[in-house]
Amino acid sequence: MPPQKENHRTLNKMKTNLFLFLIFSLLLSLSSAEQCGRQAGGALCPNGLCCSEFGWCGNTEPYCKQPGCQSQCTPGGTPPGPTGDLSGIISSSQFDDMLKHRNDAACPARGFYTYNAFITAAKSFPGFGTTGDTATRKKEVAAFFGQTSHETTGGWATAPDGPYSWGYCFKQEQNPASDYCEPSATWPCASGKRYYGRGPMQLSWNYNYGLCGRAIGVDLLNNPDLVANDAVIAFKAAIWFWMTAQPPKPSCHAVIAGQWQPSDADRAAGRLPGYGVITNIINGGLECGRGQDGRVADRIGFYQRYCNIFGVNPGGNLDCYNQRSFVNGLLEAAI
């Protein structure tokens, strides 16, 4: 064989080996990247798996143990709920009864929030409303709607059917005072876009839209209005916030599902398991530790009404009047 052909063949072989090595290195780096939680932009693990404190998905104790686990934490490491279908927990008629006046002519969000949109969105979060026994699952749905109804309420003290029948009257903040844009290299604000409160949880600020969009697979930085124009995305954004821990805050889900165990510091701050801690997670800096507060009472009123519809006990520690606020976490929801 002529020497030049041999050299050419050897060179091709070297190139092939180098290419295969680079491909292997790329696959290795991708497989070693963190999968969930704050290490992955707030992403949730698939199939209801636990997200460990280091950003990995699994269903054994190292992944699911508290404290540490960031989201979808289940004692003993059993993945919660097989499908995430909540139709067996909340019926269409219960949804309509809870949000009795959401389609009232006076409500700007009339016609927007639907039962089917909620059920569809919930399927993307297998642990939501499917963790624990039936009573616990119903309490979680009641707590979620209790908090989000306060965020979107159109009720007043003498409203027909009472103030707690008017949740989900709004789908976005009215007359926002700012663009809610904080300079960020990671989550830069898109030209002409505003990041005021939208959806059931009134998602606010560009970094929250960025984190949420990355987790649910939608570009919300460039399209924040989707949270107010697409009901499924609106519910997904709210449930994402609910399911995502904000260290040192636990997730709302972990609290209501009985997975969160308060530390000594939490106990000293008056933060004990119950609905009140969820209020602290969502808006504690403005509402908690101030004694009696009408906003906190409003959140409780919605929750108690919904628990009554589901026939479950709301439990204790419902308020955060005497709780110290958590230090600011990564996310902020309420306005």
UniProtKB/Swiss-Prot annotation:
The record's section on PROSITE patterns has: CHIT_BIND_I_1, CHIT_BIND_I_2, CHITINASE_19_1, CHITINASE_19_2
Q: Which residues form the active site?
A: 151 (proton donor)
Vacuolar targeting signal, short sequence motif: residues:
329-335
Q: Which GO terms describe its cellular component?
A: plant-type vacuole; secretory vesicle; vacuole
Q: Which UniProt keywords apply?
A: Antimicrobial, Carbohydrate metabolism, Chitin degradation, Chitin-binding, Disulfide bond, Fungicide, Glycosidase, Hydrolase, Hypersensitive response, Plant defense, Polysaccharide degradation, Signal, Vacuole
- Has UniProt tagged this entry with the keyword Disulfide bond? yes
Q: In which tissues is it expressed?
A: High constitutive level in roots with lower levels in leaves and flowering shoots.
InterPro entries recorded for this chain?
Chitin-bd_1 (IPR001002), Chitin-binding_1_CS (IPR018371), Endochitinase-like_sf (IPR036861), Glyco_hydro_19 (IPR016283), Glyco_hydro_19_cat (IPR000726), Lysozyme-like_dom_sf (IPR023346)
Which pairs of Cys residues are joined through disulfide bonds in the record?
36-51, 45-57, 50-64, 69-73, 107-169, 181-189, 288-320
Q: What induces it?
A: Ethylene induces high levels of systemic expression of basic chitinase with expression increasing with plant age. Locally and systemically induced by jasmonic acid (JA) and pathogens such as A.brassicicola and P.syringae, particularly in case of hypersensitive responses (HR). Not induced by wounding.
Q: Which terms under GO biological process does the entry name?
A: cell wall macromolecule catabolic process; chitin catabolic process; defense response to fungus; killing of cells of another organism; plant-type hypersensitive response; polysaccharide catabolic process
Query: What range does the record give for the signal peptide?
Result: 1-33
Which domain of life, per UniProt? Eukaryota
Q: What is this enzyme's catalytic activity, as reactions?
A: Random endo-hydrolysis of N-acetyl-beta-D-glucosaminide (1->4)-beta-linkages in chitin and chitodextrins
Q: What is its EC number?
A: 3.2.1.14
The entry lists its GO molecular-function terms as: chitin binding; endochitinase activity
Domain Chitin-binding type-1, by residue range, is 34-75
Compartments where located = Vacuole
Q: Which residues form the propeptide?
A: 329-335
Q: What is the effect of changing residue 206 to D?
A: In strain: cv. Ci-0
Which Gene3D superfamilies does the entry link to? 1.10.530.10, Endochitinase, domain 2, Endochitinase-like
Annotated family: Belongs to the glycosyl hydrolase 19 family. Chitinase class I subfamily.
According to its UniProt entry, the function of this protein is described as: Defense against chitin-containing fungal pathogens. Seems particularly implicated in resistance to jasmonate-inducing pathogens such as A.brassicicola. In vitro antifungal activity against T.reesei, but not against A.solani, F.oxysporum, S.sclerotiorum, G.graminis and P.megasperma.
Q: What protein is this chain from? A: Basic endochitinase B
Q: Look up and give the organism this protein is from.
A: Arabidopsis thaliana
List the top taxonomic levels of the source: Eukaryota, Viridiplantae, Streptophyta, Embryophyta, Tracheophyta
Gene expressing this chain: CHI-B
